[in-house]
């Protein structure tokens, strides 16, 4: 039997930390679905379709197999169920991240007690990386510097979005 997991997030933009979580999630799942959430409370840099394309490009470049990208609106736990999965994958960088995730786990358990959440702690090299940081440093950093934080394949897209 195949084990399917879903890694949800906004991925705006995808970072090397996100890719690291995906690679590690593949250790516990045969198939990984990256669920790009549409959050009405956030103003994204990239549209959901652009984010999907960037994630697909980064996953391909990383050579990951059995990883697909889908978009969703609404509750993540419902999306996970609709995907036929029972595992939600989450990456955490800090105690603050864990506190927010803990609240979400409790809500998800009430909504669907059959769905479990698996956490992957960020490696030291990714514990400071966030999409917000990327947006802040892109106008100032060289491509070589940015490649320490994001897949090099998406740097031109970042530059185009954040130009001027």
Q: PLM ranges: what are they?
A:
Residues 1-164:
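Nucleotidyltransferase catalytic core that binds NTPs
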């Amino acid at each position: 039997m195949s084990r399917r997991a879903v890694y949800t997030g906004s991925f705006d933009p995808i970072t090397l930390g996100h890719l690291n979580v995906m690679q590690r999630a593949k250790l516990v799942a045969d198939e990984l679905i990256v669920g790009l959430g549409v959050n009405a409370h956030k103003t994204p840099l990239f549209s959901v379709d652009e984010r999907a394309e960037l994630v697909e490009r980064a996953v391909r470049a990383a050579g990951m197999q059995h990883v697909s990208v889908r978009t969703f609106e609404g509750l993540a736990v419902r999306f996970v169920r609709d995907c036929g999965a029972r595992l939600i994958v989450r990456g955490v960088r800090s105690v603050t991240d864990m506190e927010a995730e803990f609240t979400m786990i409790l809500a998800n358990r009430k909504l669907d007690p059959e769905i479990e959440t698996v956490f992957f702690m960020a490696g030291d090299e990714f514990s400071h990386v966030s999409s917000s940081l990327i947006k802040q440093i892109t106008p100032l950093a060289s491509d070589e510097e940015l490649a320490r934080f994001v897949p090099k394949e998406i740097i031109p897209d970042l530059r185009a979005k954040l130009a001027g």
